[in-house]
């Protein structure tokens, strides 16, 4: 059996059935990330996935595929996994997973649409920022324009996706400008939900070394809150989008809908 050391999932999926698809991260180069630094990437054998499903509750209605980037397994393998879920969990109405801009580039619109038809209905995509300089500094492996292109592919394939954004990622004195660039990206992406996280410098990461060397200065609490406020102010929402800052790393807790709660959120951030 494959050894799955660390399992991460969005807090909104805490009551969802978890299905291991991979262990570790196939990229594992983001400067700020400590989640899979000491883990070798491996894909869970299909036989083990099928056994897990056979032992599960056939009345399961929702599944979350675990692993840093399950779509990195490729189209054919993902299609087989979804067909197995449909076989053993016939009442499952939604399969969700994390995804990266890098892995999405491997898929055509037609392939994404086919995965959607087989039950993959929701992706949590770590966009982090719309600032190309920051993306390069943090070694995300993509540009803002590439992120927008992949978001458009998802929309064309009828795939719902949530955008994960990280404030404080640009560093001291750069937060407001970062918010404006990120809002510009989000305005084109049009995700169903925007989930924010606060940059945390974890020991053992490349970012921790950069801080120690004086090559990255962390933003203070007040500046980070200004970044959240600026992000909300610059979001030009054509359709309703959920805005959620309730992840454990966040400095403030906001949850609701834009544009109707924009002023309410801004007032809370100004208190």
Residue ranges with predicted function:
Residues 56-157:
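Conserved SAM/AdoMet-binding glycine-rich loop
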Residues 41-44, 48, 73, 77, ...:
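Alpha-helix N-cap and loop-to-helix initiation/capping positions
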Residues 45-61:
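Short microdomains enriched in Cys/His and/or Lys/Arg
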Residues 25, 33, 49, 65, ...:
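Conserved, mostly hydrophobic/aromatic
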Residues 65, 122, 145-207, 221-245:
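Conserved C-terminal portion of the radical SAM core fold
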Residues 207-271:
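C-terminal accessory regions of radical SAM enzymes
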Residues 38, 68-70, 98-102, 128-132, ...:
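Active-site beta-loop-alpha junctions enriched in small/polar residues
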Residues 3-48:
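Canonical Radical SAM [4Fe-4S] cluster-binding loop centered on the CxxxCxxC motif
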